[in-house]
């Protein structure tokens, strides 16, 4: 335990929290070719590769993911949620934070129903996460 005098001389340091989605916390000044501090909830990007990945040990599947070049020129891997998708190379997508626990290196999600990404067809419950419009009937 430090004494009061020690705490007066050197107060306690608060812990610095590391961001879970660092690519969303940078902007890019293309004129000066420098990164800027610009926190944003989502970013726009262009798909450079769309493919599947196998998850870590206890699970087994083919998870869909896309390699995305963001508007700040950072390349990331983003998960494509839901059943079926219409993404291909050069599709423009909106990316949000949020990792996929069983896919190493995937720390972002693609927002369904925004920009070039379609919503999930035939979805009736939990539609807002998958960009599906309310059915007419």
UniProtKB/Swiss-Prot annotation:
One of its GO terms (molecular function) is rRNA binding. PROSITE patterns: RIBOSOMAL_S12 (PS00055). Residues 1-55, 118-137 are annotated as: Disordered. Disulfide bonds: none annotated. GO terms for biological process: translation. Gene3D superfamilies: Nucleic acid-binding proteins. Pfam families: Ribosom_S12_S23. Belongs to the universal ribosomal protein uS12 family. With S4 and S5 plays an important role in translational accuracy. PANTHER family: 30S RIBOSOMAL PROTEIN S12 FAMILY MEMBER. This is Small ribosomal subunit protein uS12. It comes from Staphylococcus aureus (strain NCTC 8325 / PS 47).
